[in-house]
């Protein structure tokens, strides 16, 4: 049976992650309160940020930036948007 959590990002009960996705306190916090669906949304956002900003993941500053953005995405006022990103419109 799937582990259900109250997702902090989606504001609804949803299936939780199978394991902490990151080391440390932030990973534990995400594991306890972020759903698989919300995590997949972050992976897409993270990919856009890496590509648009040409982040080198070997650079500790780039990794630190992404950690801050991860926390803002789930628990703050939202992560930065990729500069050229235009959300899709319905219709």
Swiss-Prot record:
Pfam families: Iron_traffic (PF04362). InterPro entries: Fe_traffick_prot_YggX, Fe_traffick_prot_YggX_sf. SUPFAM superfamilies: YggX-like. Keywords: Iron. GO terms for biological process: cellular response to oxidative stress. GO terms for molecular function: iron ion binding. It comes from the Bacteria. Belongs to the Fe(2+)-trafficking protein family. Could be a mediator in iron transactions between iron acquisition and iron-requiring processes, such as synthesis and/or repair of Fe-S clusters in biosynthetic enzymes. This is Probable Fe(2+)-trafficking protein. It comes from Burkholderia ambifaria (strain MC40-6).
């Amino acid at each position: 049976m799937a582990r259900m959590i109250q997702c902090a990002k989606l504001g609804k009960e949803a299936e939780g992650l199978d394991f902490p996705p990151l080391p440390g306190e932030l990973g534990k916090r995400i594991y306890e309160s972020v759903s698989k669906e919300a995590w997949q949304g972050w992976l897409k956002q993270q990919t856009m940020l890496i590509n648009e900003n040409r982040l080198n993941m070997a650079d500790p500053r780039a990794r630190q930036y992404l950690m801050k953005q991860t926390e803002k995405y789930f628990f703050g006022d939202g992560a930065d948007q990729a500069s050229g990103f235009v959300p899709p419109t319905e219709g």
